[in-house]
C-alpha cells in the first residue's frame, strides 16, 4: 500500500505550531547587545551593500568598526521555510547595523556544559528566531568605504553539531582580527530541523527531487554576499578565507568541494572537524533521511492531536 505523507503546506503549519509551543516553554532570552552611546556618537561610513545602505558602530577600540546584523538573504519563514535562501529584500534609507541579530531557532543550551562555558556568555545570549540569516563584519575604521584597501577577509562558520550556535559567539574576537588588518565576517545559518530536514513532500517541490541541506545553502549565499560586497568594507573579494570549527569545519570542507563555490574561496581553515566525523553517518542517503523526516513529522502531528 502506498504510504501517505504530509503535504508541504501541512508540514509548515505543523512546525509553526510546534515552534510557538517551544517559544512558550523556553526561558525568556536576554536582549541582544545594544550599541553604546559612545559608539553611536562616533561617525561611521555609510556603505552601499546588496539591499541598501548601512551604517555601523565603533568597537571597544575606536579604530575598529562593526556592522552587526546585516541581512544577506530574505527571512526563511512562511513560504520560504525549507527553501533555498532567496535574495534579501531591499530597504529604504539607511539601515543602522548596530545590534546583533537573533540566532537561528534552536534548543536552550546547557550553560554548565563545556560547550556552554567555553563558547557562550549567558549575559549576551541572543533571542531565537527563524528570521536568522544575518552576518556581522569587523573592519579597521581606516578601511571602511575604501574599495582600494584590499585587506584579507576571513568568513567564520560557527560549530554546534548543526544544531546550535550563532555568529557572534565569544570565542571569535572580531576586533582582534581587525586590529591586525584582517576583516572578519561571521554568519548565522539555519540549524537542526529548519536547516537540514529531508522529507518526500519537500523533495517533490524542486527539480533535483532532493531536500535538506538548507543550512549549507545559507552558508553559500553568505559567501556570495561577501564576494559581492566586501570591497565596500575595504576587503579583497579575491582573498577570502573560509574558516570554521567542529560542524563549522565540516561545513568548510563541504564548501571547498562544492561546485557552487568554485572561484569564491581563496583559502580554508578547518579546525577540529572534517567532512567525515563520528557525527556524520556514512550510511546516510536520500531514502533514509526522508524516512527520518517523515517519522519526525508524524510524531509532531500526533502530539498536536492529543
What are these regions (language model features)?
Residues 17-28:
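Bacterial N-terminal signal peptides
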Residues 226:
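A glycine-rich beta-to-alpha transition motif near the start of alpha/beta enzyme domains, typified by
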Amino acid at each position: 500500500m502506498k504510504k501517505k505523507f504530509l503535504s508541504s503546506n501541512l508540514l509548515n503549519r505543523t512546525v509553526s505550531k510546534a515552534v510557538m509551543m517551544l517559544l512558550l516553554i523556553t526561558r525568556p532570552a536576554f536582549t541582544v547587545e545594544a550599541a553604546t552611546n559612545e559608539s553611536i556618537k562616533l561617525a561611521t561610513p555609510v556603505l552601499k551593500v546588496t539591499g541598501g545602505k548601512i551604517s555601523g558602530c565603533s568597537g571597544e577600540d575606536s579604530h575598529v568598526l562593526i556592522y552587526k546584523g546585516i541581512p544577506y538573504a530574505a527571512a526563511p519563514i512562511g513560504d520560504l521555510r525549507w527553501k533555498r535562501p532567496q535574495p534579501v529584500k531591499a530597504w529604504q534609507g539607511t539601515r543602522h547595523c548596530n545590534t546583533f541579530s537573533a540566532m537561528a531557532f534552536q534548543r536552550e543550551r546547557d550553560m554548565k556544559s563545556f560547550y556552554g562555558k567555553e563558547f557562550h556568555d549567558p549575559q549576551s545570549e541572543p533571542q531565537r528566531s527563524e528570521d536568522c540569516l544575518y552576518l556581522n563584519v569587523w573592519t579597521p575604521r581606516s578601511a571602511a568605504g575604501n574599495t582600494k584597501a584590499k585587506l584579507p577577509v576571513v568568513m567564520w562558520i560557527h560549530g554546534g553539531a548543526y544544531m546550535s550556535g550563532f555568529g557572534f559567539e565569544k570565542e571569535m574576537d572580531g576586533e582582534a582580527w581587525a586590529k591586525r588588518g584582517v576583516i572578519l565576517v561571521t554568519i548565522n545559518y539555519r540549524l537542526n530541523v529548519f536547516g537540514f530536514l529531508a522529507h518526500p513532500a519537500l523533495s517533490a517541490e524542486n527539480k533535483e527531487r532532493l531536500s535538506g541541506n538548507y543550512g549549507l545553502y545559507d552558508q553559500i549565499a553568505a559567501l556570495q554576499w561577501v564576494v559581492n560586497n566586501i570591497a565596500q568594507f575595504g576587503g579583497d573579494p579575491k582573498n577570502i578565507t573560509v574558516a570554521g570549527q567542529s560542524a563549522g569545519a565540516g561545513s568548510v570542507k563541504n564548501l571547498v568541494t562544492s561546485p557552487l563555490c568554485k572561484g569564491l574561496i581563496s583559502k580554508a581553515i578547518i579546525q577540529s572537524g572534517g567532512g567525515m566525523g563520528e557525527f556524520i553517518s556514512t550510511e546516510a542517503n536520500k531514502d533514509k533521511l526522508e524516512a527520518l523526516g517523515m517519522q519526525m513529522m508524524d510524531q509532531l502531528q500526533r502530539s498536536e492531536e492529543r
